[in-house]
């Protein structure tokens, strides 16, 4: 039986393969979720640069959020990163959830990013 760490690594590798297969040169919307905060970046893997980034620790959001660890905070981060990406000229991305299950905060962030103008 696989340990929880091995399961996480396998899931991350599986998602990474899927993202790589469908990317076709599109930037990647990469999500990292911790117990207290959520972080997201729009990364251009071809050039190796971060186009836009946002997190619950951003000055724009930190004072407005009750906590960085709930779905409302994730939605605010999703909307903010979408706004920054559209401003930088990116409208189509590939969603990279990493090893995180598409549920709860990750799902709230994705839906808010779609509402903000990103398509994936």
From Swiss-Prot:
GO terms for cellular component: cytosolic large ribosomal subunit. It comes from the Bacteria. Keywords: Ribonucleoprotein, Ribosomal protein, RNA-binding, rRNA-binding. The keyword Ribosomal protein applies. One of its GO terms (molecular function) is structural constituent of ribosome. InterPro entries: Ribosomal_uL18_bac-type, Ribosomal_uL18_bac/euk. Pfam families: Ribosomal_L18p. One of its GO terms (biological process) is translation. The keyword rRNA-binding applies. Belongs to the universal ribosomal protein uL18 family. This is one of the proteins that bind and probably mediate the attachment of the 5S RNA into the large ribosomal subunit, where it forms part of the central protuberance. Part of the 50S ribosomal subunit; part of the 5S rRNA/L5/L18/L25 subcomplex. Contacts the 5S and 23S rRNAs. This is Large ribosomal subunit protein uL18.
